[in-house]
Regions:
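N-terminal, positively charged/glycine-rich alpha-helical extensions of SAM-dependent methyltransferases
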Residues: 2-37
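Conserved alpha-helix/loop element of class I SAM-dependent methyltransferases that forms part
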Residues: 47-64
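Class I SAM-dependent methyltransferase SAM/SAH-binding core
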Residues: 68-126
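A short glycine-rich, Lys/Arg-flanked "PGG" loop and its adjoining helix->strand segment in the class I
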Residues: 151-163
């Protein structure tokens, strides 16, 4: 069944996948198991640079009307976006019931008057029905997938971004050389092993996110590195 679903997706987006390139997504993956400690783990691993990196270009997001956030986790970025943009309406998608609950709790506590501007949806991205948006945000989300599925997602983003729409991506990056090149590779490997053990995640290495985005005719507007190049926030149009 999974093979049929993903082959159908690939066909619909013009991508042919060989048997050894099958998109590996296990719908039994449960990020509920890490929801309670997600912010702590993220902060500990990166000395809070993961949270900081997500906000690199939030000041550029003050005029958009509609936004899709995929894999939004516990709602840190969502809170900051609502504070920056006083009129935006956000569709907030996460596969974890507990992550969604944490995000709702955060906004209820920090920005209670803004809850009406957020639609919380608990679904896997392959089950989500896209609409059209001024902004699509993927913070530490695309690293959960292999190149083939990231390609499908980026093509879909292209279809569903409005004219002059923005694509906002923050994720891990391997520095080209030096100590941080090797230490980041080891750190990312440890994270994938940990997440694989907890959630049954099958991906073992970072996808080539930037290359895939640029191949789909997005233009890089802004880019900034954190944690000596191990984390990057990129803003595309």
């Amino acid at each position: 069944m999974h093979k049929l679903i993903y082959n159908a997706l690939a066909t619909s987006y013009g991508v042919k996948l060989k048997d050894n390139q099958k998109i590996k997504m296990n719908k039994t993956q449960s990020y509920d198991r890490i929801a309670f400690g997600y912010d702590f783990i993220a902060g500990l691993f990166s000395f809070n640079q993961i949270n900081k990196s997500q906000l690199a270009f939030v000041s550029h997001l003050s005029t958009q009307g509609t936004c899709l956030i995929l894999g939004g986790g516990t709602g840190y970025f969502l809170q900051k976006l609502l504070e920056e943009n006083k009129t935006i309406h956000v569709t907030y998608v996460d596969a974890s019931v507990k992550m969604i609950a944490s995000a709702q709790k955060r906004i209820s506590k920090k920005r209670p008057s803004e809850l009406y501007r957020v639609s919380f949806i608990c679904k896997h991205v392959e089950d989500f029905q896209f609409e059209n948006y001024d902004l699509i945000v993927c913070n530490y989300f695309l690293d959960l997938f292999d190149d083939a599925y990231v390609t499908l997602l980026i093509e879909r983003f292209k279809q569903h971004l409005k004219k002059d729409g923005l694509l906002y991506i923050t994720d891990f990056s391997i520095p080209e050389k030096g100590f941080m090149h090797w230490s980041t590779k080891v750190g990312v490997k440890i994270l994938y092993t940990l997440f694989g053990w907890i959630t049954s995640l099958s991906v073992q290495h970072l996808p080539n996110i930037k290359s895939i985005v640029l191949q789909n005719n997005f233009v890089l507007l802004e880019s900034v590195a954190f944690f000596k190049g191990a984390l990057k926030c990129n803003l595309y149009k």
